[in-house]
């Protein structure tokens, strides 16, 4: 019978975690239909079946780590049903065989998983629940057998919430503290919450530590007077929206264009080390950090040197929406040359951003704060000021070049007409 294997994803991705089975055992599967969601280091991707039939075996469970090329499901012949629970009663031999196989798999799982994902001898007694409900139940330690479905005899997430909100039975009340004490006995007097890190969070933690350990990272600072760029934006924003189908003119396009100009002037900032070689990139794919519920993601705006302000703004907006809706593809997340992060949207006045992997530097933007500035010896004016930071790999970039790069950014933002002329 045809197997479904973890597909090739990207050069830097070798494994993933099964986030959710989108199909239950016994469900009908169409050719090209997604059967599970796989969480990778960068994005979540759906794995599809290359054959039509029935999902006859799940060779891995939600939460399991699987490698590229590994078989994770078997597609059998037949039309299938809405779920395994509604399978035909006239195939007892097949049901017994499936039950025995399921028992073997269950004995190899941890006690906690077995409690939630238990399989009875009779398939008809197996709890009918949506994949997301099974995952939610496992994360919250809820036994699905104790949950009463509201509609169609299928347990859903809201049924689990209702079960948790209901007054607990005496047995449950007595059992819960014992489990808590066993799990958190190293914190006997203080309340804590322990939860498993997501794959993306674990990967981010690992890579951030690798960058800190494997680069000679240093940060230099400067400040930018935002007066001129704010006035230009105020004058042009309405006409800009009319001319470009509602696309808004923001500050990111100015900083992106300024970064491209500075990268051309200081090409070592657009480089990376590969073994004993230094690779200087001749393209300008700028990463823009986007905050999501799953953490910080860095999709890339491609060929920024060839795009105008409107195209850059539209692409940034599109990538931000895709990131928050979890629709980013792997192509959006790899092979960038430089990154910009804006901590100012969260109120950060100053920071030392960490370099993105396979890059030599990252530009940090911050809050715009009005403060008194000495214009000359006799004049002090309140000006909208922003601190900017450049974290860089000192193995590649000397201090002189780093300071010069940041000074170029400052000069271009303070004289935005020069950016418009360059574009």
Swiss-Prot record:
It holds the Pfam family 2-oxoacid_dh. Its EC number is 2.3.1.61. Residues 76-185 are annotated as: Disordered. It comes from the Bacteria. It catalyses: N(6)-[(R)-dihydrolipoyl]-L-lysyl-[protein] + succinyl-CoA = N(6)-[(R)-S(8)-succinyldihydrolipoyl]-L-lysyl-[protein] + CoA. Residues 1-76 form the Lipoyl-binding domain. Belongs to the 2-oxoacid dehydrogenase family. NCBIfam families: PRK05704.1 (NF004309), sucB (TIGR01347). This is Dihydrolipoyllysine-residue succinyltransferase component of 2-oxoglutarate dehydrogenase complex. It comes from Staphylococcus aureus (strain MRSA252). The gene is odhB.
